[in-house]
Amino acid sequence: MKYLSLFSGIGGFELGIQQANMCQPKCVGYSEIDKYAIQVYNKQFNHKNYGDITKINASTLPDFELLIGGFPCQSFSIAGKRGGFNDTRGTLFFDVARVLKEKQPRLCLLENVKGLLSHEQGATFRTIISTLDELGYDCQWQVLNSKNFGVPQNRERVFIVGHLRGTSRPEVFPIGGADREDTRNVGEDLSYTIDANYSKGTNTLEKGRRQLIKGDTAIRRLTPKECERLQGFPDDWTKEGMDGLISDTQRYKMCGNSVTVPVIKEIINKLINY
């Protein structure tokens, strides 16, 4: 299956696809502007970077069957009760939508923070779903927590799967059940969410996020390698880029911005069964 990656970061979606049972996945390109993330991505993958999504001419993109990406949560200027494609102008989701409108891939998989569901009293999420509906996509979604996918991190994200009407409908959600590997019983070993501002924290507890763990003799911060593990990446995934070593500050940021790889793997495995 050919896919296009947007807001690609360090390649969490791509690694999840690699680990899934997809037959001969091929990335036709990715879009990323953070220079450190690009360095890491290019060290791990040999894909073309189309750069700033706002400057991509969608008509020049190769054809693909699946669009993937985690876009920022932004407010829309909604003129009426039902937001649509035109109401998303000025946001990065608009650029996702215009690529979908131009290329009409069979499937899309989008990720965002759980707060998207309640942002602006739910108006933001309604506009996103209405826009996808306007573009011909039926959608399903679910909030998934990384702790239920074999990593000890309490990280909730909403995932949206859209399928083009007239094509086979993948029944992806709900995901979960009694047979789900769950790390809730690890107690004190469960980390709170790693976010992009982790490196700015001190040895305190802020905003409900536990940034410290108990060592053998003292309390300490997580290391970048441990943050990689909590997101399901191999050790030292972010340690080096194409131009050499990456600072710990940037490694914390990139891990915090990434998706959790095992979650993507599970979703992709559900997608490709249809």
Predicted regions and their residues:
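Short coil/turn segments at secondary-structure junctions
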Residues: 80-83, 112, 250-251, 255
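A broad, structural surface signal
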Residues: 39, 126, 130, 265-269, ...
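Core alpha/beta nucleotide-donor-binding catalytic domains of modification enzymes
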Residues: 1-107, 114-126, 133
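Short histidine/acidic/glycine/proline-rich micro-motifs that form metal-
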Residues: 113-118, 146-150
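Short beta-strands and strand-loop turn motifs
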Residues: 107-113, 142, 245
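Class I SAM-dependent DNA methyltransferase catalytic core
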Residues: 20, 135-137, 141-274
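Short glycine/proline-rich turn/loop motifs
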Residues: 75-77, 109, 243-249
